[in-house]
C-alpha cells in the first residue's frame, strides 16, 4: 500500500480502500481532489477544476477540453482551403456515436467497450513469419494505458519477439508533445 501510494500520489487510505485496484476514472478524480481538480483521461498532464470536488467522477476529460477545439477549428479551416463543403459540423467526440457504434469483436459487457484486435494479430503472425508489430504509447495516457496494450498482446498468442514497444513522454496523442512526435516520426520512417 505504501509503495502504491508513493508511486501514484494517492493516499494510502484510498489505495487500501480500493483493495489495490484503482480504476483510471477513480485515479483521475482522486489524485487532485483536495485541490478541486481532476486530471485528463487522454493526457493526465492536464487538469481541470471540477464543479463538485466530492463527486464520484470527473466532470469531463480535462485533456480533451484542452486541445479538441483547436483540432476541430484547424480541420474546418483546412476543409475550407481545399474546397471541401460539409453539411454537418465535425465534432471531435460524440456520445451518440459511441452508444450506437457496432462493437463487433467486443467483450460481452456494457462498459468499457472496445474492439480487441490482438487475437487477429497473433493469428496473422502465425500465418506470416514476417509480420511485425509496432506499439507506441504515451505514459500519461489513461484511456489506453501502455501496460494494457502489452498485456493484451501477451494474452493473445502474439509473438513478442516480433513486437516493438515504444513509450513516449506524452498522452494518447503523442503529437501534442513535440519531442515525442519527432521521435515517433523517426521510428516509423
Feature-to-residue mapping (PLM):
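Catalytic histidine neighborhood in serine/cysteine hydrolases
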Residues: 157-173
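A cross-kingdom marker for long, charged
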Residues: 134-137, 165-166, 174-175, 187
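Alpha/beta-hydrolase fold catalytic core
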Residues: 1-143
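Composition- and surface-driven signal marking solvent-exposed, interaction-prone regions
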Residues: 137, 146-151, 180-181
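Catalytic histidine-centered segment of alpha/beta-hydrolase-like enzymes
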Residues: 171-181
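Short, amphipathic alpha-helical "lid/cap" segments that border enzyme active or binding sites
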Residues: 181-188
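Feature representing long, continuous alpha-helical segments
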Residues: 119-122, 147-150, 186
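Active-site-adjacent alpha-helix of alpha/beta-hydrolase-fold enzymes
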Residues: 142-162
